[in-house]
Amino acid sequence: MYYGFDMGGTKIELGVFDANLQRIWHKRVPTPREDYSLLLQTLHDLTREADEFCGSKGSVGIGIPGLPNADDGTVFTANVPAAMGQSLQGDLSGLIGREVRIDNDANCFALSEAWDPEFRRYPTVLGLILGTGVGGGLIVNGNIVSGRNHITGEFGHFRLPVDALDILGADIPRVSCGCGHNGCIENYISGRGFEWMYKHFNQQSLPATEIIANYNLGESKAVAHVERFMDVLAVCLGNLLTMLDPHLVVIGGGLSNFEHIYQELPKRLPQHLLRVARLPRIEKARYGDAGGVRGAAFLHLSK
């Protein structure tokens, strides 16, 4: 059995998956945000409850909204203050008597999609999240590529490419980013960036849902905005494809529900790729909110 924890700032969800990778049990509880001992006890109790349900001990994986430190295994996660700087992996492993694997929740998203029955045949899968920010993960032969510092999927912190500046104008503000730098692409091609860009060019604040609704009605400002956004998205994704050359791209996050993306990217991407390059397959994520739990459980499928 494979146990996967999706540990967020407000809730912890545990999913149990059988040998066929089908979810057979799950439970959700509030996250103890401030008390590390209580956080460990909560994870312990959920694990024991799953053991009782299964009649055996399953493997344990945890997806966190943050990064494990590559050198000492401590956790960096602003959303769960109780776990910040703690050796969560080692502490929980000692408490429940088995190996625990921990990874970034965006990597878990990508791993979940890569282990989809249809998608497993693709050797390299790029999971791309276009949500409040931009991130994701790279999966090669069913395994997460973490890199030296566990930051391989931090795509949102690439700077705006020169071709994007040609589209947006050289005087486009280099928006300050939470990482401490300016001009990171997540401030332009995320859901938040989608709204910011509309406000910048139209001097009007609208939520993404309303902009998209106006676009579907053919409203001129919304149409011009979406065209501009798609061009910038294609430039940024083109750089990623040239660097990583995946067979499959799976898009998640709030903007993944904008179906126009899947029609427009194949038209716009080729001009930003090498002439010999063939487009990867581009698909919408299949597992939605369940992807974090699935991917965390499947950390034990990786080598």
Swiss-Prot record:
GO MF assignments: ATP binding; N-acetylglucosamine kinase activity; zinc ion binding
Classification of source organism: Bacteria, Pseudomonadati, Pseudomonadota, Gammaproteobacteria, Enterobacterales
PANTHER family: N-ACETYL-D-GLUCOSAMINE KINASE (PTHR18964:SF162), ROK (REPRESSOR, ORF, KINASE) FAMILY (PTHR18964)
Top-level EC class as recorded in UniProt: transferase
Organism: Yersinia enterocolitica serotype O:8 / biotype 1B (strain NCTC 13174 / 8081)
NCBIfam families: PRK13310.1
Catalytic activity: N-acetyl-D-glucosamine + ATP = N-acetyl-D-glucosamine 6-phosphate + ADP + H(+)
Family under the similarity heading: Belongs to the ROK (NagC/XylR) family. NagK subfamily.
EC number: 2.7.1.59
Superkingdom classification of source: Bacteria
UniProt-recorded name of the protein: N-acetyl-D-glucosamine kinase
Keywords recorded for this protein, A-Z: ATP-binding, Carbohydrate metabolism, Kinase, Metal-binding, Nucleotide-binding, Transferase, Zinc
Pfam families noted in UniProt: ROK
Positions contributing to ATP binding: 4-11, 133-140
Pathways per UniProt: Cell wall biogenesis; peptidoglycan recycling
GO biological process terms on file: N-acetylglucosamine metabolic process; peptidoglycan turnover
Residues the record lists as binding Zn(2+): 157, 177, 179, 184
Reported function: Catalyzes the phosphorylation of N-acetyl-D-glucosamine (GlcNAc) derived from cell-wall degradation, yielding GlcNAc-6-P.
